[in-house]
């Protein structure tokens, strides 16, 4: 199974690539946003700032949105989750627009939000068991997603008195504000559960063919 990380050119993606490859996936880095779509799983990583990342994504923004809306499996981490939204107060440029809403600055005295925090499932919208979220995960960010409505939110977290989505899901796209690759064994289990779910769906489609 091919897993492609979109490289915005902003940092070292080694730890994330290593965590994904540990499950036997063929992990590749790609700087051409259009080329990232020739994959089984697209990963929008959590390294960088919104403006430069949006600029890197811009040449294929609509193609990426259409592919995700059509069901291409995608994992979007931290900044990557923020890129699923329409735009951000952090910088110029457009996000993918898969999730209606914007990204805003954290409303907290201590910014950035760095360290371990709880991930609380959002009741009826909680992720399926194959995508069990870690109960505690590692966060590192100064901006948070503000969806127009909560239907796609699968988990929440709170920093001081500021509550915001810890995870969202639309079609086969899962966005998480935390860093799974930095969230110990539970984070790695989340990554492997996501890849296992993609494999299972692909296998089911294959067995259903005449």
Language-model features, listed with the residues they occupy:
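Pocket-forming structural segment of enzyme catalytic cores
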Residues: 86-161
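C-terminal and late-domain segments of enzyme folds
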Residues: 145-210
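Two-component/phosphorelay signaling modules centered on CheY-like receiver
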Residues: 16-26
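Cysteine-nucleophile active-site neighborhood
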Residues: 48-117
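Short acidic low-complexity segments
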Residues: 27-38
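Short glycine-/small-residue-rich Rossmann-like dinucleotide-binding loops
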Residues: 10, 46-48
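Short, Asp-centered acidic motifs that coordinate Mg2+ and/or phosphate
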Residues: 41
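Extreme N-terminal starter segment of soluble prokaryotic enzymes
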Residues: 1-4
């Amino acid at each position: 199974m091919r897993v492609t990380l979109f490289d915005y050119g902003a940092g070292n993606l080694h730890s994330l690539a290593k965590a994904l490859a540990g499950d036997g996936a063929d992990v590749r880095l790609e700087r051409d946003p259009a080329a990232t779509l020739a994959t089984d799983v697209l990963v929008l990583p959590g390294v960088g700032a919104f403006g430069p990342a949006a600029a890197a994504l811009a040449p294929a923004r609509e193609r990426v949105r259409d592919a995700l809306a059509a069901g291409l499996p995608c994992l979007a981490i931290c900044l990557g989750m923020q890129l699923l939204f329409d735009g951000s107060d952090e910088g110029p440029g457009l996000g993918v627009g898969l999730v209606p809403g914007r990204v805003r600055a954290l409303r907290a005295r201590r910014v950035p939000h760095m360290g371990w925090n709880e991930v609380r499932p959002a009741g009826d919208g909680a992720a399926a068991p194959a995508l069990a979220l870690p109960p505690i995960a590692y966060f590192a960010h100064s901006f948070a997603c503000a969806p127009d409505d909560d239907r796609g939110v699968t988990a929440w977290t709170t920093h001081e008195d500021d509550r915001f989505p810890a995870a969202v899901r639309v079609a086969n796209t899962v966005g998480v504000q935390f860093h799974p690759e930095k969230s110990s064994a539970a984070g790695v289990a989340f990554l492997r559960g996501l890849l296992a779910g993609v494999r299972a769906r692909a296998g089911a489609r294959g067995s259903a063919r005449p």
